């Protein structure tokens, strides 16, 4: 039961860190390439 409580307390923290990092990455991409539907360096 203690292991289950440890797992249930670790999973939200890891997911919050992951989604925070992903949101930050998307924000930085949109800062350098605003409104980019197609990236010019791929074509």
From Swiss-Prot:
Pfam families named in the record: PSI_PsaJ (PF01701)
InterPro entries per UniProt: PSI_PsaJ, PSI_PsaJ_sf
Provenance organism: Oenothera argillicola (Appalachian evening primrose)
Subcellular location(s) per record: Plastid, Chloroplast thylakoid membrane
Family statement: Belongs to the PsaJ family.
Topology in membrane: Single-pass membrane protein
Keyword Thylakoid recorded: yes
HAMAP family in alphabetical order: PSI_PsaJ
GO cellular component: chloroplast thylakoid membrane; photosystem I
Keywords: Chloroplast, Membrane, Photosynthesis, Photosystem I, Plastid, Thylakoid, Transmembrane, Transmembrane helix
Predominant location category: plastid
Top-level taxon of the source organism: Eukaryota
GO biological process: photosynthesis
SUPFAM superfamilies, sorted: Subunit IX of photosystem I reaction centre, PsaJ
Functional summary from the UniProt entry: May help in the organization of the PsaE and PsaF subunits.
TM segment ranges: 7-27
Protein name from the UniProt record: Photosystem I reaction center subunit IX
């Amino acid at each position: 039961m203690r292991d289950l409580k440890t797992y249930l307390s670790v999973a939200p923290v890891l997911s919050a860190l992951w989604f925070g990092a992903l949101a930050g990455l998307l924000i930085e991409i949109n800062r350098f390439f605003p409104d980019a539907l197609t990236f010019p360096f791929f074509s």
